[in-house]
Amino acid sequence: MLTQQLLSIGVNHFLTISVILFGLGMFAVMTRKNAIVILMGVELILNAANINFLTFSKYNGGMEGVMFSLFVIVLAAAEAAIALAIVINIFKTFKTVDVSSVDTMKE
């Protein structure tokens, strides 16, 4: 019974989840001022792209989506490491992670 329900999941379901994740990520990036929340929004956007790549890869039968998805995962890991290092330096300098209060990089 459970396997029949899982087999009935189509492209529309995956794309709907992807659009919801992308929308939440864009909302976080556009409206929040905390740098860490903005980074989480960017990660949500990248995960939405991964779901799209994997969905079209599964239903087209090719491996290109899987390869793009692995590339995006590596890119997201590097982006997170670099961005968190920048956020830590901003916090050490300005004692805040609010991006609206950081308008210059000098002390």
UniProtKB/Swiss-Prot annotation:
Entry's localization field? Cell inner membrane
Q: Which reaction does it catalyse?
A: a quinone + NADH + 5 H(+)(in) = a quinol + NAD(+) + 4 H(+)(out)
Assigned keywords, A-Z: Cell inner membrane, Cell membrane, Membrane, NAD, Quinone, Translocase, Transmembrane, Transmembrane helix, Transport
Its record classes its membrane topology as: Multi-pass membrane protein
Recorded family membership = Belongs to the complex I subunit 4L family.
Transmembrane segments in this chain: where?
A: 9-29, 36-56, 68-88
* Matching InterPro entries: NADH_UbQ_OxRdtase_chain4L/K, NUOK/Mnh_C1-like
The EC number on file is 7.1.1.-
Which top-level enzyme class is recorded in the Swiss-Prot or TrEMBL entry? translocase
One cellular component (GO) term of this entry: plasma membrane
The gene from which this protein is expressed is nuoK
Assembly behavior: NDH-1 is composed of 14 different subunits. Subunits NuoA, H, J, K, L, M, N constitute the membrane sector of the complex.
Q: Does the keyword Transport belong to this entry? A: yes
- This one is known as NADH-quinone oxidoreductase subunit K
- What role does this protein play? NDH-1 shuttles electrons from NADH, via FMN and iron-sulfur (Fe-S) centers, to quinones in the respiratory chain. The immediate electron acceptor for the enzyme in this species is believed to be a menaquinone. Couples the redox reaction to proton translocation (for every two electrons transferred, four hydrogen ions are translocated across the cytoplasmic membrane), and thus conserves the redox energy in a proton gradient.
Q: Which one of the record's GO molecular function terms can you name? A: quinone binding
Q: Does the keyword Transport apply?
A: yes
Give the primary localization class: membrane
> Per the UniProt entry, what is one GO biological process?
ATP synthesis coupled electron transport
